[in-house]
Design a protein with these regions (language model features):
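Conserved beta-strand-loop surface patch within small alpha/beta domains used
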Residues: 1-72, 80-135
Length: 135
């Protein structure tokens, strides 16, 4: 999985801010022909330290992705007080076969997973960083 470093840094900063109030950042992973971006959604959960991707946001992002020739390939969320490893609730709520990226809000550490048959399997990821060139 190739992730945009600038995009991930922005989401990690948002995760740190939300963690101050026991909130989690969450959203969808959108694959644009090999480059995956994290697209934030509203967190519909009313409980601290939990997330629920807003269904209307999910639908809108999925429709926009299809129009652009992209596709939703998974979800992401932050953990405030634990390693970026899927817990039992994360696995139960996951879409079978989708990727899941978890960010540690405190450290910015990120890990990618694939959820299949009730189990989490670690995915390799790397970052793409764009270089600005002078004209």
């Amino acid at each position: 999985m190739i992730l945009d470093r600038k995009n991930v840094r922005a989401i990690a900063a948002r995760a740190r801010r939300l963690a101050e109030n026991l909130g989690e950042v969450c959203g969808l992973l959108v694959d644009h022909g090999g480059l995956v971006t994290l697209v934030e959604t509203r967190n519909k959960s009313t409980r601290p330290l939990s997330f629920w991707i807003h269904p209307a946001d999910w639908k809108a992002i999925e429709q926009a992705a299809v129009r652009l020739g992209s596709r939703v390939v998974g979800t992401f969320h932050s953990h405030m007080a634990s390693d970026p490893v899927p817990g039992a609730g994360d696995i139960r709520g996951a879409v079978h076969g989708h990727a899941m990226v978890i960010l540690d809000a405190a450290t910015g550490d990120l890990r990618a997973w694939r959820i299949r048959k009730g189990r989490a399997f670690r995915l390799r990821h790397r970052f793409l960083q764009y270089r600005q060139t002078a004209n």
